């Protein structure tokens, strides 16, 4: 399955980002890597014009993430965040989960499922989010 989609992944995306990168490339998606600061993400968004940006919400920070989300929303870029449950504040988690345009990845995850979830979301195909809860054994 070849796609015309482009994904930007923050380089702080620990461990499994290589599996996700391989799976996305296998499906014909262009994958770019950038730094994990707000300015590096903004530069990557302008330089590569991705359809999706994968972000560690804890590295970027809650307030910067919400500000960055507004910038991405204007450019029709879909943010995908992970490590959301490492926040101690349940109110912060609740607020982040309430945004419909932010996709969430639970850790650990199956790279193949996340890849297909991302591509289906880009194609506007309804997907059961429970697929992301399947852990690698």
Which role fits each region the language model picked out?
Residues 4-14, 20-24, 53:
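Conserved acidic segment of CheY-like receiver
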Residues 35-52, 60:
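Acidic, metal-coordinating helix/loop segments flanking the phosphotransfer/catalytic sites
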């Amino acid at each position: 399955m070849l796609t015309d989609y482009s994904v930007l992944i923050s380089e702080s995306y620990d461990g499994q980002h290589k599996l996700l990168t391989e799976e996305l490339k296998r499906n014909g998606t262009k994958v770019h890597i950038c730094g994990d600061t707000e300015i590096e993400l903004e530069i990557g968004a302008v330089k590569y014009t991705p359809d999706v940006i994968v972000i560690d919400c804890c590295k970027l920070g809650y307030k910067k993430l919400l500000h960055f989300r507004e910038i991405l929303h204007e450019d029709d870029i879909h943010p995908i965040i992970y490590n959301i449950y490492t926040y101690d504040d349940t109110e912060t988690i609740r607020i982040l989960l309430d945004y419909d345009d932010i996709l969430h990845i639970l850790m650990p995850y199956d790279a193949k499922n996340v890849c297909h979830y991302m591509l289906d979301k880009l194609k506007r195909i309804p997907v059961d989010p429970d697929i992301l809860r399947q852990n690698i054994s």
